[in-house]
Amino acid sequence: MTLLRAPQRFQYASRVFTSTSLSTPRHAYLTYSRVRSLTSTSHHPTKSHPSLSSSTSNTTSVEENDAPKSQCTPQASQHIPWYLQEESSVPAVSEVTLQEKLPELPENPPKILPELLEYIFKDLGLDELKLIDLRPLETPSALGANVIMIIGTARSVKHLNVSADRLCRWLRSEYKLSPYADGLLGRNELKIKLRRKNRRARIASRTGTMFDDKDDGITTGWICVNAGVVEEHPVEERVEGDFEGFGPLVGGTRVVVQVFTAEKRAEMDLETLWEGRLARAQRERQKHADAAKDDAPEEVRYPNSISPSPSDYKSPNVPRSWISLPHEQRRQFHIRSLRSFARPAHHAVFTPRFMSQNHTPAEHAIVGSELSSPTAMLLQYITTMPDQQLMSALGDRPDDESSTDFLRLFHHSLLGASPNVLALARLELLCLAHSRGHTGISKESVHRAFMGCCFSASHIPDRLIPTVVDILLTPRTGDNPDGEKWFTDADKELALSALDQLVLRGNDFMNLQFFTRLYYLSSLPPGPPGEENDDGLTPAERGAHVVRMIEILDIPFDPIHARTLMVYLFRNGDYDAFMKWWRTLPLKNSPRTREDYEMLFRLHADSGDSRLTRECISTWAPMMSREDPPIWLEGDLVAHLRDCLLLADERTPARAAEGTQSLFAKLWRACERELNKSEVV
């Protein structure tokens, strides 16, 4: 009994618990209708706690007060746990719909774009979506032409990789596309790298060393998902002079999704970059549109107008040039006669009657087809002049502007012309003078006119390009044209700069004809003989790099220019390269002919090298009968072979007369028989 009796100071607690458990359910104290305050009291019952009777009476009174409430509200007697209670309805401050969070669609969007945006925002969970339409850019980006770029922010690095991986799988499964995610790690690869990184961190913490948290390629924070072409459309015809930024021109719209983390997106700031480019492109288009609007003629009349208004007549100063180029001067519609062009009084020698003469189609091709331009007609007229009259009309220097009446009239017709028209007209005149044999044309003037056409984006006719290249690749000579020739370093710089521009314009110089001429020019000395600028190299050493370029670049074989190159190689002393090309002829489906053997023996006879000539006769004279078809001794071949035999051994005629059966003696007797036959005939 003593063990079951509670201590005296805790008797009230046991009685309170007993009375409470008998009167009310245990969980009644957990309801929200009653709140129990927390107080700090002493453990002595006489000071801090009321008597047992008062406590019991208070409890009973409280229960009696609660009884009527439970009877009035029967639902209150049923306890609802806190995790099952319904939250109080809080009015929504601002509800943003899905369409309001998605960016607006551009004009003419591809069919996949709305579904792609919804999938990126709703399923992948990317935030702050931004759509940039790069299709208006004339020069496409490195991603290609006609790009629509979507920029989104991921919540973490793991979310970044998972979103990009799911997007690629969705594009492949739903639309059969072939997306490429630049910077994406595979699922297993990312887990393995993260696991290894955590292991290194644990090992570093155990050993007490510092963990080098370097950039290991896991947390790049940027993945570019290129979906490729999502909608095909026909490729527009390219305008000549237009450029494609990177890669070939492909029709269709491509979509690129740029996924960033928040920090990386703020660092890269692609929105500012591309929006700035779009703004500049828009300003350029607006500038061209305003210029075209200002230059547009106020009124265009049909050619069959009978009574034109007096305001339609304009001053006949400088009409439009014959060169039709985009973004140039405005085109004027008129029906004026050719005789209506005004001309100065001191140019009476050029009367209008030559402008109405009948010209051949070839002359039309030289100067253009728009006969309404006085510049074109002046060039057309000068093509009909005899050579002597043309030389006097052009003077000593055709690049001069006032030395002759023709040059003054020619440059007067170009007053007010645009820079590209002016440069091309001067280039036309210089090329025309060179084609007629004028010797006063300088390379500098042709190069200046040519580069002016290139810098002004002028269209250079194909017929002028060979003439320009021929002028710039012509060696310099002294007073004697047949004397020594040289090609200076300044001439090389002029030629290379012009060739660079021609290659950029799409001209093909990867042919043996061009490289043969390069070899000839590179083998020339850099200055006149007797001056200090001689480099001390032999012609073969100067042109050796061109021969190596022909082999490395695998220049296509040309039978005619290959034989020309062989002549240059032999005369420059590069016998090994000559014999290499000589043996290559049959392998290139170009069998050796009688003319080839005539060239072979003529070059050896002119060389004066007896040892080299002796080897040539011993090796290749017996091969003539083995060629397909066989080559017999006749014509000029006999004379060249006799010269080689005399150079190889002066005693060959005497030994042949003695009846010696050596190869040289037999060949000499065969040559003598052929010469006797030709004399008899």
Curated annotation (Swiss-Prot):
<comment type="similarity">
    <text>Belongs to the ATP25 family.</text>
</comment>
<keyword id="KW-0999">Mitochondrion inner membrane</keyword>
<dbReference type="GO" id="GO:0005743">
    <property type="term" value="C:mitochondrial inner membrane"/>
</dbReference>
<dbReference type="GO" id="GO:0048255">
    <property type="term" value="P:mRNA stabilization"/>
</dbReference>
<dbReference type="InterPro" id="IPR040152">
    <property type="entry name" value="Atp25"/>
</dbReference>
<dbReference type="GO" id="GO:0140053">
    <property type="term" value="P:mitochondrial gene expression"/>
</dbReference>
<feature type="transit peptide" description="Mitochondrion">
    <location>
        <begin position="1"/>
        <end position="45"/>
    </location>
</feature>
<keyword id="KW-0472">Membrane</keyword>
<feature type="compositionally biased region" description="Polar residues">
    <location>
        <begin position="304"/>
        <end position="314"/>
    </location>
</feature>
<feature type="compositionally biased region" description="Low complexity">
    <location>
        <begin position="40"/>
        <end position="61"/>
    </location>
</feature>
<dbReference type="InterPro" id="IPR043519">
    <property type="entry name" value="NT_sf"/>
</dbReference>
<protein>
    <recommendedName>
        <fullName>ATPase synthesis protein 25, mitochondrial</fullName>
    </recommendedName>
</protein>
<dbReference type="Pfam" id="PF02410">
    <property type="entry name" value="RsfS"/>
</dbReference>
<feature type="region of interest" description="Disordered">
    <location>
        <begin position="284"/>
        <end position="320"/>
    </location>
</feature>
<keyword id="KW-0809">Transit peptide</keyword>
<keyword id="KW-0496">Mitochondrion</keyword>
<comment type="function">
    <text>Probable mitochondrial mRNA stabilization factor.</text>
</comment>
<feature type="compositionally biased region" description="Basic and acidic residues">
    <location>
        <begin position="284"/>
        <end position="301"/>
    </location>
</feature>
<feature type="region of interest" description="Disordered">
    <location>
        <begin position="40"/>
        <end position="74"/>
    </location>
</feature>
<dbReference type="GO" id="GO:0005739">
    <property type="term" value="C:mitochondrion"/>
</dbReference>
